[in-house]
């Protein structure tokens, strides 16, 4: 199954579970200066807005960034960040609580590329295998990353090498996530 289909289904499962548990779509703190096409409804009394993932039109691409960094991104990374706008997805895998990072709007996509650039350059400076982060964990300094040379999705402490493989690739990672 493609990354696009896996991601679409993951967003749907996350939305369905949230609706079942809260009678609302997933919530995000509303920021008038940071609007998203995935926002639905009105801001609630706590300052939150409901959201539902929507297709990016046109689709985002990391190809120019890959060329600028002189790297090849693993298959599926473009789809993971360039297919949909949405909030982050809370899930678990292999006993770890993770937050899959997603793109909220076109400005967020630009910011993501800046963050990826900084991360790759940091890995080069440390002479470590290059990775791209795709998620967070309950531990502040533990990231979910994709190894560029293999495509494996791994856990990585900030500034350290990856130390635990979660999935062989992005597609298998998305399939294994439980919401």
From Swiss-Prot:
Keywords, in A-Z order: Cell inner membrane, Cell membrane, Membrane
Residues annotated as transmembrane: none
Superkingdom per UniProt: Bacteria
Pfam families attached to this UniProt entry: Syd
Membrane topology: Peripheral membrane protein
Cross-referenced InterPro entries: Syd, Syd_sf
Gene Ontology, cellular component aspect: cytoplasmic side of plasma membrane
Protein name: Protein Syd
Compartment(s) of residence: Cell inner membrane
Keyword Cell membrane listed: yes
Known function: Interacts with the SecY protein in vivo. May bind preferentially to an uncomplexed state of SecY, thus functioning either as a chelating agent for excess SecY in the cell or as a regulatory factor that negatively controls the translocase function.
Species of the source: Pseudoalteromonas translucida (strain TAC 125)
Family: Belongs to the Syd family.
């Amino acid at each position: 199954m493609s990354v696009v289909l896996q991601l679409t289904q993951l967003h749907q499962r996350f939305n369905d579970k949230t609706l079942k548990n809260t009678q609302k779509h997933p919530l995000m703190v509303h920021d008038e200066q940071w609007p998203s096409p995935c926002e639905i409804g009105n801001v609630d009394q706590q300052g939150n807005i409901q959201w539902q993932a929507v297709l990016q039109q046109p689709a985002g691409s990391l190809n120019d960034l890959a060329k600028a960094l002189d790297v090849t991104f693993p298959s599926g990374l473009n789809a993971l960040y360039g297919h949909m706008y949405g909030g982050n997805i809370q899930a678990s895998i292999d006993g770890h609580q993770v937050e899959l990072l997603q793109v909220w709007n076109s400005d967020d996509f630009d910011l993501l590329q800046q963050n990826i650039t900084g991360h790759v350059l940091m890995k080069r400076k440390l002479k470590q295998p290059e990775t791209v982060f795709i998620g967070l964990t309950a531990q502040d300094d533990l990231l979910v990353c994709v190894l560029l040379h293999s495509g494996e999705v791994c856990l990585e402490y900030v500034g350290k090498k990856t130390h635990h493989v979660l999935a062989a690739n992005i597609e298998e990672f998305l399939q294994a996530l439980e919401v």
